[in-house]
Regions:
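Rossmann-fold dinucleotide-binding core
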Residues: 4, 96-179
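Rossmann-fold NAD(P) dinucleotide-binding segment
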Residues: 53-114
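NAD(P)+-binding Rossmann beta1-loop-alpha1 motif at the extreme N-terminus of oxidoreductases
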Residues: 1-65, 88, 124, 156
C-alpha cells in the first residue's frame, strides 16, 4: 500500500487526507498544531499523526504540503535539506508567490529532489471529494509521472507548461478574479443600501442575469487589442460609474471598487479613447 506524507492538516489538508484514504493510501500527517493531526489519526487507523516533519516524511513515497504561504513552506521544508533521498517527490499545494516558487523548485531540484507546485481551485469539500481543479507546471516528465496520482485528488488536472512558477501565477490570476467579484458584490450591496433596496433583493438580479458569462468575451477583447467597433463605449461606461457614485453618495455610502475603475477610464478618455470599447481603458500599457 502506498504511503504519503501530508504536511498541514487545516481544512484543505484534512480534505486531501480524507480523499487519500478513500483512494486506499496510508497517510503520515503532521501539523504545527498537533491536535489537528491527532484528531484525524484518532478517527482512522490509516492515518498516523507524527510529532515532527522528519518523522512524517520517513518512508513516504510522496510528500504533500498544504500550508499558508512561502515562508511557512520554506520553514517546513528547509530543515529537510540533506535528509530527503535523491528522487524524493515534494508536491506543494500551497498558494505561493511566483518568484519564490521558481526559486524553491530550483533549489530543491539542485538537491536532487523532484519538487512540483500544484495549487488548486478547490474548497475543503472538493478536496475530500476529489473535485475541482488542480494546476501544475514544470518539467513535463514530472507532470507525466505524477499525473495518475494527482488526477485521483481532483476533478481536473491542468498542465500549464514547463516553467515551474506558472501554476503559482495562474493560481493568483484566478484568486484575483474571485476576490475581485467579492469586491464588486460589496459595491452592489452598498449601492443597494444607498437607494433603499435590501441587499438580498438586489442580489436576486443574479438569478436572472449572469455577468460571469461575459468574462471570456471581455478577456478576449482586452487581450486582442481590438477596441472597435465598441460593444460598450468607454465614455458611456464612465457615465454609468458616475451615476453609481452619485447615488451611493446620496444614500451616505462610499463605493470601494468603482473609484479605481473610474480613474482608469478617466485616463483613457484623457487619451482621446472615449469612443473606443471600455476594454481599452483597462489594458496594460505596453502589454
Amino acid at each position: 500500500m502506498t504511503t504519503i506524507a501530508f504536511l498541514g492538516t487545516g481544512l484543505m489538508g484534512t480534505g486531501f487526507i480524507q480523499r487519500a484514504r478513500a483512494n486506499g493510501l496510508t497517510v503520515r500527517a503532521w501539523n504545527r498544531s498537533a491536535a489537528k493531526a491527532q484528531a484525524l489519526a484518532g478517527n482512522d487507523a490509516g492515518v498516523t499523526a507524527c510529532a515532527t516533519v522528519a518523522e512524517a516524511v520517513r518512508g513516504a513515497e510522496r510528500i504533500h504540503l498544504s500550508l499558508s504561504d512561502d515562508a511557512s513552506v520554506d520553514a517546513v521544508l528547509e530543515p529537510l535539506a540533506g535528509a530527503l533521498p535523491a528522487g524524493a517527490w515534494v508536491v506543494d499545494h500551497t498558494t505561493t508567490a511566483v518568484r519564490p516558487t521558481a526559486e524553491r523548485v530550483a533549489r530543491w531540484t539542485a538537491r536532487g529532489v523532484r519538487c512540483v507546485h500544484a495549487p488548486v481551485f478547490m474548497a475543503p469539500a472538493n478536496c475530500a471529494e476529489g473535485t475541482g481543479w488542480m494546476l501544475i507546471s514544470g518539467d513535463p516528465a514530472r507532470h507525466q509521472a505524477l499525473q495518475p496520482a494527482l488526477q485521483l485528488m481532483t476533478g481536473s488536472l491542468v498542465y500549464l507548461g514547463p516553467q515551474p512558477e506558472r501554476a503559482a501565477a495562474f493560481k493568483l490570476f484566478g484568486n484575483l478574479t474571485l476576490l475581485g467579484i467579492l469586491g464588486v458584490l460589496g459595491d452592489v450591496g452598498r449601492l443597494a443600501a444607498a437607494v433603499g433596496i435590501d441587499m438580498k433583493d438586489a442580489f436576486s438580479l443574479f438569478e436572472h442575469f449572469n455577468p460571469g458569462q461575459t468574462l471570456p468575451q471581455r478577456a478576449k477583447r482586452i487581450s486582442s487589442g481590438q477596441y472597435t467597433p465598441p460593444s460598450f463605449e468607454m465614455s458611456m461606461a464612465r457615465k454609468d460609474l458616475r451615476l453609481m457614485e452619485e447615488e451611493a453618495a446620496r444614500g451616505g455610502q462610499t463605493l470601494a471598487m468603482v473609484p479605481a475603475l473610474a480613474k482608469l477610464l478617466d485616463e483613457g478618455i484623457a487619451r482621446g479613447e472615449g469612443q473606443l470599447d471600455v476594454a481599452a481603458g483597462v489594458r496594460v500599457p505596453g502589454a
